[in-house]
Amino acid sequence: MNILPYEIHLLVIDYLYNDDLSIYFVNKYFFSMLKHSKIQNTIIKKIIKKGELGVIRYINKLFRVNDELVIGNKLFESSGINNYLLTACKYGHCKLVKYFVECGADIHYKTDYALQLACKYGYLEIVKYLVKKGANINTDDCYAVQLASREGHLKIVKYLVELGTNVRKDRDLAFRWSVENNHLSVTKYLVELGSDVRSEKNYAIKKSCEYGYFEMTQYLMNQGANFRVDNDYAVRFASKKWTFKYCRIFDIMWR
Protein backbone atom coordinates (compact mmCIF):
# COMPACT_ATOMS: atom_id res chain seq x y z
CA MET A 1 0.00 0.00 0.00
CA ASN A 2 2.91 2.38 0.67
CA ILE A 3 3.74 2.45 -3.02
CA LEU A 4 0.38 4.06 -3.76
CA PRO A 5 -0.26 7.82 -3.66
CA TYR A 6 -2.10 9.15 -0.63
CA GLU A 7 -5.16 9.93 -2.72
CA ILE A 8 -5.42 6.29 -3.78
CA HIS A 9 -5.30 5.22 -0.13
CA LEU A 10 -8.38 7.32 0.53
CA LEU A 11 -10.15 6.04 -2.56
CA VAL A 12 -9.52 2.44 -1.57
CA ILE A 13 -10.77 3.06 1.96
CA ASP A 14 -13.95 4.65 0.62
CA TYR A 15 -14.62 1.63 -1.57
CA LEU A 16 -13.97 -0.80 1.26
CA TYR A 17 -17.10 0.60 2.92
CA ASN A 18 -19.09 0.53 -0.28
CA ASP A 19 -21.07 -2.34 -1.75
CA ASP A 20 -19.77 -1.49 -5.23
CA LEU A 21 -17.29 -4.20 -6.19
CA SER A 22 -15.80 -2.50 -9.24
CA ILE A 23 -12.54 -1.38 -7.65
CA TYR A 24 -11.72 -4.92 -6.57
CA PHE A 25 -11.71 -6.04 -10.19
CA VAL A 26 -9.03 -3.60 -11.35
CA ASN A 27 -6.20 -6.09 -10.84
CA LYS A 28 -5.08 -8.97 -8.62
CA TYR A 29 -3.69 -6.61 -6.00
CA PHE A 30 -6.99 -4.80 -5.54
CA PHE A 31 -8.81 -8.12 -5.60
CA SER A 32 -6.71 -9.33 -2.66
CA MET A 33 -8.08 -6.46 -0.56
CA LEU A 34 -11.44 -8.21 -0.41
CA LYS A 35 -10.21 -9.84 2.79
CA HIS A 36 -10.56 -6.40 4.41
CA SER A 37 -13.99 -5.73 2.93
CA LYS A 38 -17.06 -4.89 5.00
CA ILE A 39 -19.24 -6.90 2.60
CA GLN A 40 -21.20 -9.50 4.55
CA ASN A 41 -22.58 -11.89 1.93
CA THR A 42 -21.18 -13.98 -0.89
CA ILE A 43 -20.13 -11.91 -3.88
CA ILE A 44 -20.07 -14.61 -6.55
CA LYS A 45 -23.52 -13.79 -7.93
CA LYS A 46 -22.71 -10.08 -7.92
CA ILE A 47 -19.65 -10.80 -10.02
CA ILE A 48 -21.74 -12.86 -12.44
CA LYS A 49 -24.36 -10.09 -12.71
CA LYS A 50 -21.59 -7.74 -13.83
CA GLY A 51 -20.48 -10.27 -16.45
CA GLU A 52 -16.92 -10.50 -15.10
CA LEU A 53 -15.77 -13.72 -16.75
CA GLY A 54 -12.11 -12.99 -16.05
CA VAL A 55 -12.78 -12.57 -12.34
CA ILE A 56 -14.75 -15.83 -12.19
CA ARG A 57 -11.89 -17.65 -13.91
CA TYR A 58 -9.44 -16.14 -11.43
CA ILE A 59 -11.54 -17.18 -8.42
CA ASN A 60 -11.67 -20.74 -9.73
CA LYS A 61 -7.90 -20.67 -10.10
CA LEU A 62 -7.54 -19.56 -6.46
CA PHE A 63 -9.75 -22.42 -5.32
CA ARG A 64 -7.69 -24.93 -7.29
CA VAL A 65 -4.51 -23.86 -5.49
CA ASN A 66 -6.23 -23.56 -2.09
CA ASP A 67 -5.44 -19.87 -1.81
CA GLU A 68 -6.15 -18.44 1.65
CA LEU A 69 -8.12 -15.56 0.15
CA VAL A 70 -10.97 -17.82 -0.94
CA ILE A 71 -10.70 -20.92 1.27
CA GLY A 72 -13.07 -20.55 4.20
CA ASN A 73 -13.99 -16.99 3.19
CA LYS A 74 -17.75 -16.43 3.37
CA LEU A 75 -17.48 -13.94 0.51
CA PHE A 76 -16.81 -16.88 -1.78
CA GLU A 77 -19.32 -19.37 -0.42
CA SER A 78 -20.81 -21.25 -3.33
CA SER A 79 -24.50 -21.62 -4.11
CA GLY A 80 -23.67 -24.13 -6.82
CA ILE A 81 -22.62 -23.93 -10.44
CA ASN A 82 -26.16 -24.62 -11.66
CA ASN A 83 -27.44 -21.54 -9.85
CA TYR A 84 -24.57 -19.54 -11.33
CA LEU A 85 -25.69 -20.66 -14.78
CA LEU A 86 -29.20 -19.38 -14.05
CA THR A 87 -27.84 -16.01 -12.94
CA ALA A 88 -25.76 -15.68 -16.11
CA CYS A 89 -28.83 -16.49 -18.22
CA LYS A 90 -30.97 -13.97 -16.37
CA TYR A 91 -28.49 -11.14 -16.93
CA GLY A 92 -27.60 -12.06 -20.50
CA HIS A 93 -23.91 -12.92 -20.19
CA CYS A 94 -23.45 -15.51 -22.92
CA LYS A 95 -19.72 -15.99 -22.32
CA LEU A 96 -20.38 -16.83 -18.70
CA VAL A 97 -23.18 -19.18 -19.71
CA LYS A 98 -20.79 -21.05 -21.99
CA TYR A 99 -18.10 -21.10 -19.30
CA PHE A 100 -20.39 -22.61 -16.66
CA VAL A 101 -21.68 -25.22 -19.10
CA GLU A 102 -18.08 -26.11 -20.00
CA CYS A 103 -17.37 -26.44 -16.27
CA GLY A 104 -20.20 -28.94 -15.88
CA ALA A 105 -23.36 -26.92 -15.17
CA ASP A 106 -26.55 -28.83 -15.96
CA ILE A 107 -28.59 -27.00 -18.59
CA HIS A 108 -31.63 -29.08 -17.60
CA TYR A 109 -31.49 -27.95 -13.96
CA LYS A 110 -34.97 -27.14 -12.63
CA THR A 111 -36.62 -28.43 -15.83
CA ASP A 112 -34.63 -26.33 -18.29
CA TYR A 113 -35.05 -23.16 -16.27
CA ALA A 114 -31.91 -21.66 -17.83
CA LEU A 115 -33.58 -21.68 -21.25
CA GLN A 116 -36.79 -20.26 -19.83
CA LEU A 117 -34.88 -17.38 -18.20
CA ALA A 118 -33.11 -16.58 -21.46
CA CYS A 119 -36.47 -16.56 -23.26
CA LYS A 120 -38.07 -14.39 -20.58
CA TYR A 121 -35.34 -11.75 -20.66
CA GLY A 122 -34.88 -11.79 -24.42
CA TYR A 123 -31.38 -13.19 -24.96
CA LEU A 124 -31.62 -14.94 -28.31
CA GLU A 125 -27.91 -15.80 -28.47
CA ILE A 126 -28.15 -17.65 -25.15
CA VAL A 127 -31.37 -19.36 -26.22
CA LYS A 128 -29.71 -20.67 -29.38
CA TYR A 129 -26.65 -21.84 -27.46
CA LEU A 130 -28.69 -23.75 -24.87
CA VAL A 131 -30.83 -25.35 -27.57
CA LYS A 132 -27.65 -26.39 -29.38
CA LYS A 133 -26.51 -28.01 -26.14
CA GLY A 134 -29.75 -29.96 -25.88
CA ALA A 135 -32.12 -27.80 -23.85
CA ASN A 136 -35.75 -28.84 -24.20
CA ILE A 137 -37.91 -26.03 -25.58
CA ASN A 138 -41.13 -27.84 -24.64
CA THR A 139 -40.74 -28.40 -20.89
CA ASP A 140 -43.56 -27.26 -18.60
CA ASP A 141 -46.08 -27.29 -21.45
CA CYS A 142 -43.95 -25.09 -23.72
CA TYR A 143 -43.41 -22.48 -21.02
CA ALA A 144 -40.40 -21.01 -22.85
CA VAL A 145 -42.45 -19.67 -25.77
CA GLN A 146 -45.14 -18.49 -23.37
CA LEU A 147 -42.59 -16.42 -21.45
CA ALA A 148 -41.12 -15.00 -24.66
CA SER A 149 -44.63 -14.06 -25.80
CA ARG A 150 -45.48 -12.44 -22.49
CA GLU A 151 -42.36 -10.28 -22.62
CA GLY A 152 -42.72 -9.41 -26.32
CA HIS A 153 -39.61 -11.11 -27.68
CA LEU A 154 -40.86 -11.83 -31.20
CA LYS A 155 -37.53 -13.09 -32.56
CA ILE A 156 -37.33 -15.71 -29.82
CA VAL A 157 -40.96 -16.71 -30.35
CA LYS A 158 -40.32 -17.19 -34.06
CA TYR A 159 -37.13 -19.15 -33.38
CA LEU A 160 -38.92 -21.54 -31.02
CA VAL A 161 -41.75 -21.96 -33.51
CA GLU A 162 -39.21 -22.85 -36.20
CA LEU A 163 -37.98 -25.58 -33.87
CA GLY A 164 -41.49 -26.96 -33.52
CA THR A 165 -42.78 -25.67 -30.20
CA ASN A 166 -46.54 -25.55 -29.67
CA VAL A 167 -47.75 -21.97 -29.19
CA ARG A 168 -51.28 -23.12 -28.38
CA LYS A 169 -50.55 -24.97 -25.15
CA ASP A 170 -52.63 -24.11 -22.08
CA ARG A 171 -55.55 -22.87 -24.14
CA ASP A 172 -53.53 -20.28 -26.07
CA LEU A 173 -51.73 -18.94 -23.00
CA ALA A 174 -48.92 -17.47 -25.12
CA PHE A 175 -51.48 -15.47 -27.11
CA ARG A 176 -53.39 -14.31 -24.04
CA TRP A 177 -50.20 -13.18 -22.30
CA SER A 178 -49.08 -11.27 -25.39
CA VAL A 179 -52.38 -9.39 -25.39
CA GLU A 180 -52.33 -8.75 -21.66
CA ASN A 181 -48.91 -7.10 -22.00
CA ASN A 182 -49.78 -5.24 -25.22
CA HIS A 183 -47.25 -6.89 -27.53
CA LEU A 184 -49.24 -6.45 -30.73
CA SER A 185 -46.59 -7.81 -33.10
CA VAL A 186 -46.41 -11.04 -31.10
CA THR A 187 -50.20 -11.22 -30.89
CA LYS A 188 -50.56 -10.89 -34.66
CA TYR A 189 -47.94 -13.56 -35.27
CA LEU A 190 -49.63 -16.01 -32.90
CA VAL A 191 -53.02 -15.39 -34.49
CA GLU A 192 -51.46 -16.10 -37.88
CA LEU A 193 -50.37 -19.44 -36.42
CA GLY A 194 -53.91 -20.25 -35.40
CA SER A 195 -54.34 -18.88 -31.88
CA ASP A 196 -58.01 -18.39 -31.04
CA VAL A 197 -58.87 -14.75 -30.30
CA ARG A 198 -61.94 -15.99 -28.41
CA SER A 199 -60.12 -18.46 -26.17
CA GLU A 200 -61.08 -18.58 -22.50
CA LYS A 201 -64.36 -16.75 -23.07
CA ASN A 202 -62.81 -13.85 -24.98
CA TYR A 203 -60.31 -13.22 -22.21
CA ALA A 204 -58.00 -11.32 -24.56
CA ILE A 205 -60.36 -8.54 -25.59
CA LYS A 206 -61.65 -8.14 -22.05
CA LYS A 207 -58.11 -7.54 -20.82
CA SER A 208 -57.29 -5.32 -23.77
CA CYS A 209 -60.24 -3.08 -22.92
CA GLU A 210 -59.46 -3.19 -19.21
CA TYR A 211 -55.92 -1.91 -19.80
CA GLY A 212 -56.90 0.61 -22.46
CA TYR A 213 -54.99 -0.91 -25.38
CA PHE A 214 -56.67 0.85 -28.30
CA GLU A 215 -54.77 -0.71 -31.22
CA MET A 216 -54.89 -4.15 -29.62
CA THR A 217 -58.64 -3.90 -29.04
CA GLN A 218 -59.22 -2.76 -32.60
CA TYR A 219 -57.14 -5.64 -33.95
CA LEU A 220 -58.91 -8.26 -31.83
CA MET A 221 -62.31 -6.98 -32.90
CA ASN A 222 -61.26 -7.14 -36.54
CA GLN A 223 -60.24 -10.75 -35.93
CA GLY A 224 -63.66 -11.63 -34.55
CA ALA A 225 -63.26 -11.25 -30.79
CA ASN A 226 -66.60 -10.73 -29.05
CA PHE A 227 -66.63 -7.67 -26.78
CA ARG A 228 -70.24 -8.32 -25.71
CA VAL A 229 -69.51 -11.45 -23.63
CA ASP A 230 -70.08 -11.63 -19.86
CA ASN A 231 -72.91 -9.15 -19.89
CA ASP A 232 -70.92 -6.55 -21.85
CA TYR A 233 -67.95 -6.71 -19.46
CA ALA A 234 -65.59 -4.97 -21.90
CA VAL A 235 -68.12 -2.25 -22.71
CA ARG A 236 -68.90 -1.59 -19.07
CA PHE A 237 -65.23 -1.43 -18.12
CA ALA A 238 -64.37 0.96 -20.95
CA SER A 239 -67.30 3.24 -20.13
CA LYS A 240 -66.39 3.44 -16.43
CA LYS A 241 -62.86 4.63 -17.16
CA TRP A 242 -64.04 7.59 -19.25
CA THR A 243 -60.66 8.97 -20.21
CA PHE A 244 -59.64 9.84 -23.77
CA LYS A 245 -57.90 6.49 -24.14
CA TYR A 246 -60.98 4.55 -23.08
CA CYS A 247 -63.34 6.78 -25.05
CA ARG A 248 -61.46 5.76 -28.20
CA ILE A 249 -62.00 2.10 -27.33
CA PHE A 250 -65.64 2.74 -26.50
CA ASP A 251 -66.04 4.48 -29.85
CA ILE A 252 -64.75 1.62 -32.00
CA MET A 253 -67.05 -0.83 -30.25
CA TRP A 254 -70.10 0.82 -31.73
CA ARG A 255 -68.96 1.68 -35.21
Curated annotation (Swiss-Prot):
Keyword ATP-binding: no
Each ANK repeat, start to end: 79-109, 110-139, 141-169, 171-199, 201-229
Keyword list, A-Z: ANK repeat, Repeat
Pfam families (alphabetical): Ank_2
Annotated Gene3D superfamilies: Ankyrin repeat-containing domain
PANTHER family per record: ANKYRIN REPEAT PROTEIN (PTHR24188), GH09064P (PTHR24188:SF29)
The protein's name in its UniProt record: Putative ankyrin repeat protein R880
Organism field: Acanthamoeba polyphaga mimivirus (APMV)
Lineage: Viruses, Varidnaviria, Bamfordvirae, Nucleocytoviricota, Megaviricetes
